[in-house]
Amino acid sequence: MSKCILIVIDSLGVGEAPDAENYGDIGANTFGNVAKANGQLNLPTFEKLGFGAITNINGLKDEVTCSIVGKLAESSKGNDSTTGHWEIGGLITQRDFSVFPKGFPSELIDKISSETGHEFIGNYHASGTEIINELGEEHLSSGKLILYTSGDSVFQIAAHENILSIDDLYKICKISREYCNEYNIGRVIARPFIGDKGNFQRTYDRKDFGITPPGETILSQLFKNGKNSLGIGKISDLFGDEFLSNSIHTEGDKNGLEILISEYEDNRYDFYFINLVDLDMLYGHREDPAGYYEGLKIIDNGLDKLISVLNLSLIHISEPTRPLY
């Protein structure tokens, strides 16, 4: 194999995993349930790739014409993005990251506040879109940063760009990352947003501050064998950039796929690793199956140009037909 493209589509699951009961996910099947919610789907590329043969998806034929398809379950403990990406990259982990359903310890927040000079509001389990609507006005008037978590091991800090610059938000998250290490927190996430009350919107300048993988991955092995790897999207946030030849930020799935196609045609890399986030960020967490279908159409169109070189993988759920919070 001279070149490989690995695409991770955030949240697009094809059925519950064997350990679904541990995470409250019995009955989950994101692709199938989105199809049910929309009547049926018209996704010719996904159909060509054989997704209708993996699980029952209204509108997609149960046949495989140009690919080899299958369904995998994680061997690692945990169901978060970091764990899933690491395992796709060849690193199995046996220790769950810590989660904080009741909020983070006051001593952790006090340490971060003391060093950064910023106070926090929130500190509870919430959807990102919901919490900026709930606390956005208070944040604008007080200057205090919005802190929240989710079902994953994430320490998320949201700030309006008129209150805190993106660079300063990144600096605060980088400091927070150091303190979060001792609490076994998987990711610190910067969540900048814009807009006015009633119309707050998160931007694509999100940045994840993860943990360096504690073992070998496909990226480290390729690097040691003289191969060049390109990370597109949040790959460098989850794996670090030590073994990437280059890393490119994206402004959504359409932009990410356009970058992938352009870079592939330039033929400068051996391994192309991309993460597509819109289904998760824009539609899954907002419980919007109609929007999710529109997002699938964008991906379907982009994949049409890549069928002959795809190594397609899906990771975790944030299913718009199932409440997450």
Protein language model features and the residues they cover:
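Extreme N-terminal starter segment of soluble prokaryotic enzymes
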Residues: M1-I5
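Active-site regions of oxyanion-processing enzymes, predominantly non-cytosolic
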Residues: G143-I146, G186-V188, L260-D280
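A long, amphipathic alpha-helix that forms part
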Residues: E258-Y264, D280-L314
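Single conserved hydrophobic/aromatic residue that forms the stacking wall/gate
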Residues: I315-Y325
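Functional beta-strand-loop-alpha-helix junction segments that form "active/interaction loops"
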Residues: G231-L260
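A glycine-rich, aromatic-flanked flexible loop/lid motif
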Residues: S229-D241, N267-L282
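Extended, H/D-rich, highly charged conserved domains that either
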Residues: A159, D167-G233
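Active-site nucleophile/metal-coordination loop of metallo-enzymes that catalyze phosphate/sulfate
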Residues: S11-H160, L164-D167, R191, N199
